[in-house]
């Protein structure tokens, strides 16, 4: 008789934990699954929860059904957030794939977002290297390497100097 009540309390604890995680920020479905399956930190150190795969599936399904968990919304917010921090489309795509988002969902969200990647790349280069962007070859290579590291595409980087009067 104690078995059903302990299962229910396990489900309730897992659901409570999921809601607390999602209250902080949006997560992808894969991120939420990973965090729910991970041990909980307590005063005595990491404490493993007795979570069954069925309970985990029920909690994730409940979160999706009640719109606490939405990968499409997460992708849009993630793209906006990372682009505001100065990252380019290649890096954002790579980070989203690490978070378990399907490639077609990422590509659709990238098409839907209204971001001018060339002007963002120019802003990042000007912030790092100053107002007239360098025109010497060695300095251009440094700027290019920096922007590639930040995740901008080569054609966006080349567009900066194409429209730049020396």
UniProtKB/Swiss-Prot annotation:
Coarse class of the protein's main subcellular location: cytoplasm
Subcellular location: Cytoplasm
Keywords tagged on the record: Cytoplasm
Keyword Cytoplasm applies: yes
Domain of life: Bacteria
GO biological process: regulation of DNA repair
Paired cysteines (S-S): none
GO cellular component: cytoplasm
NCBIfam families in the cross-refs: PRK00117.1-1
Stated family: Belongs to the RecX family.
Role summary: Modulates RecA activity.
Protein's UniProt name: Regulatory protein RecX
